[in-house]
């Protein structure tokens, strides 16, 4: 069983599982991540949101997180552990955490829970998501313009609604530019495994794709594109520093404002379980700088982005 790692971040900087007398008066907000916060992708961006909470709310809050939590029995234990250790608001950030959160939320009715990308709610469990498909439509348009082969390699994690939605949106965007555009797909059945992601990228390039897309969390696939002199897109975070010549753009997740608002609601006593779906218009989904592409392609992407914002 993968060992659960916990880090408790306080303004005094020490890492500890103990709650001090001073911290006892604070609201303790906690996060559970399926990957490491150093993935520079999905889990990293959620953790940046946690840090935004600390900066915005200061000594009103105490935060903690668990990283590298497997979806399954480990998740049950992770959520229960945090609830028992005094977390009053707990965010689960992976689709596979849904049933564990439902189970633990029922067991701890006085604790507030939120689950990202899921669909099950209860009196003390809300859900939240972002319209990542909006960004994937733009990626598809760019890919169709930039790919000489008319073929993208698409690395995907698990066959869940969020991932399938992303594939469909990407292809709709691509085929709005080139009706004959195709994508070759590799399912790696993991959110974060740099080795598998790199191998998948190499295989897709070897099979004729000349641009890479991913719904996994590491920078490995984009780095393969950089090594081969090909193009690709970052995922969840701006990965330009890992592939300065290969990255065309990246869908970036900005969870900070949402997390701040929900923790503030918990502090105010106004928190209620919600069903929130944020997008480009709300600033939760952002496109990083459009780079390594002609001006006309950049203008096309910016125009599509504006249309999405304008509705």
Regions of interest found by a model, annotated:
Residues 1-4:
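Positively charged n-region of N-terminal signal peptides that target proteins for export
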Residues 7-16:
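Bacterial N-terminal signal peptides
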Residues 17-23:
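Sec/Tat signal peptide C-region and signal peptidase I cleavage site
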Residues 24-311:
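A residue-level marker of the well-folded mature domains of exported/periplasmic proteins
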């Amino acid at each position: 069983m993968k060992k659960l790692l916990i880090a408790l971040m306080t303004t005094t900087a020490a890492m500890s599982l103990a709650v001090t007398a001073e911290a006892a008066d604070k609201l303790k907000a906690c996060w559970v991540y399926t990957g490491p916060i150093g993935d520079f992708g999905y889990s990293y961006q959620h953790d940046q949101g946690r840090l935004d909470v600390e900066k915005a709310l200061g000594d009103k809050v105490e935060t903690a997180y668990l990283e590298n939590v497997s979806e399954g029995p480990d998740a049950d234990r992770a959520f229960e552990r945090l609830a028992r250790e005094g977390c009053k608001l707990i965010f689960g950030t992976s689709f596979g955490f849904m049933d564990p959160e439902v189970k633990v939320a029922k067991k701890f009715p006085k604790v507030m829970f939120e689950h990202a990308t899921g669909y099950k709610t209860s009196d003390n469990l809300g859900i939240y998501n972002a319209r990542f498909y909006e960004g994937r439509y733009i990626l598809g348009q760019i890919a169709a313009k930039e790919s000489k082969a008319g073929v993208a390699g698409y690395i995907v994690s698990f066959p869940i609604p969020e991932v399938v939605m992303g594939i469909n949106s990407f292809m709709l965007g691509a085929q709005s530019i080139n009706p004959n555009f195709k994508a070759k797909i590799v399912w790696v059945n993991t959110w974060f495994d740099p080795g598998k992601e790199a191998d998948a990228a190499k295989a897709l390039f070897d099979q004729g794709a000349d641009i890479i897309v991913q719904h996994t969390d590491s920078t490995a696939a984009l780095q393969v594109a950089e090594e081969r002199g090909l193009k690709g897109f970052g995922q969840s975070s701006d990965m330009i520093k890992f592939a300065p010549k290969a990255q065309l753009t990246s869908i970036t997740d900005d969870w900070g404002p949402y997390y701040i608002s929900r923790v503030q609601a918990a502090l105010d006593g106004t928190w209620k379980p919600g069903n929130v779906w944020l997008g480009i218009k709300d600033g939760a989904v952002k496109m990083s700088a459009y780079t390594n592409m002609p001006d006309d392609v950049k203008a096309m992407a910016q125009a599509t982005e504006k249309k999405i914002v304008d509705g």
